[in-house]
Amino acid sequence: MPTPHEAEKQITGPEEADRPPSMSSHDTASPAAPSRNPCCLCWCCCCSCSWNQERRRAWQASRESKLQPLPSCEVCATPSPEEVQSWAQSFDKLMHSPAGRSVFRAFLRTEYSEENMLFWLACEELKAEANQHVVDEKARLIYEDYVSILSPKEVSLDSRVREGINKKMQEPSAHTFDDAQLQIYTLMHRDSYPRFLSSPTYRALLLQGPSQSSSEA
């Protein structure tokens, strides 16, 4: 004879713990989600980082390629002895001579101040540009390469000139860097030019004659 408890189970059915888990129509239609592949975590930590590194390298290569149009070299004819001697007459004559700029730039490289000449040349090229779209792009590159405090080739400019450039960069023009170019020109004239005239480089040219060609690497 069943006990009262067993009789109650017969009437009400099995307890919840005894019932098999019910399955919804959604559960029966969809297969169980696969277990997480341990390789997924490895891809997130390794492959994605490698992909980001590739993107950074591609961005850097693109930026460097954009900087190539900036004037970085000049090829010039062999200077005559008279031309070499004229460089000592004034800094203007040196800077107006392609061969003079080439030799002077090589000298600045030995003093780790070549960026001054590069900046001056870039400003000269900018002033000769008439296309506004090209002016905007070149002005941005000049700023990033020679004016920004984050650049390894930053030139020495006072705060007044820097503030003026920052304002002009809102609407760049071919003359955005005129004040800065003059300041760097004056710096090279007063600081580097006297040392250049007394350097072995210039003295050798005075004695050498016209046999050696002058070009910038």
Swiss-Prot record:
Residues 207-217 are annotated as: Interaction with GIPC. SMART domains: RGS. GO terms for biological process: autophagy; G protein-coupled receptor signaling pathway; negative regulation of signal transduction; small GTPase-mediated signal transduction. Residues 90-206 form the RGS domain. Keywords: Autophagy, Lipoprotein, Membrane, Palmitate, Phosphoprotein, Signal transduction inhibitor. GO terms for molecular function: GTPase activity. Highest expression in lung. Placenta, liver and heart also express high levels of GAIP. Pfam families: RGS. Its main location: membrane. It is a lipid-anchor. The modification Phosphoserine is found at S24, S97, S151. It comes from the Eukaryota. Residues 1-29 are annotated as: Disordered. Fatty acylated. Heavily palmitoylated in the cysteine string motif. Phosphorylated, mainly on serine residues. It is found in: Membrane. GO terms for cellular component: Golgi apparatus; membrane; plasma membrane. InterPro entries: RGS, RGS_sf, RGS_subdom1/3, RGS_subdomain_2. Interacts with GIPC PDZ domain. Interacts with GNAO1. Inhibits signal transduction by increasing the GTPase activity of G protein alpha subunits thereby driving them into their inactive GDP-bound form. Binds to G-alpha subfamily 1 members, with the order G(i)a3 > G(i)a1 > G(o)a >> G(z)a/G(i)a2. Activity on G(z)-alpha is inhibited by phosphorylation and palmitoylation of the G-protein. This is Regulator of G-protein signaling 19.
